[in-house]
A protein has these predicted regions:
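Short, basic-rich loop-to-helix N-cap that marks the start of a DNA-contacting helix
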Residues: 39-52
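Short C-terminal boundary/hinge segments that cap the last helix of small helical domains
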Residues: 55-70
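Key DNA-contacting residues within the recognition helix of helix-turn-helix
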Residues: 34-35, 48, 62
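Core residues of bacterial helix-turn-helix
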Residues: 15, 26, 53-54
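Recognition helix of helix-turn-helix/homeodomain-like DNA-binding domains
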Residues: 27-42
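Residues in the helix-turn-helix
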Residues: 21, 32, 60
Length: 70
């Protein structure tokens, strides 16, 4: 199973950006970003916004998993 929150947190760290930075990009408080890190799943609209903010296609993770399982 993909834990999307962990993947988002890892990518944010890889880019050397903070939760506060992502919060500003998403117009939410950094405490909400920390809650996102703990989520195993996420709303697609929110994932799209995060993908755009980080310039990273998190949907590809699901696509790769789907292809591997077929």
């Amino acid at each position: 199973m993909i834990h999307i929150g962990h993947l988002i947190e890892e990518e944010l760290q890889r880019q050397e950006r903070s939760a506060a930075w992502l919060g500003r990009k998403l117009y939410c408080d950094r405490t909400n970003i920390y809650k996102i890190f703990k989520r195993e799943s996420i709303d697609t609209d929110l994932l799209l916004r995060i993908s755009k903010a980080l310039n990273y296609n998190f949907f590809q993770c699901y696509s790769d998993r789907l292809n591997a399982d077929m």
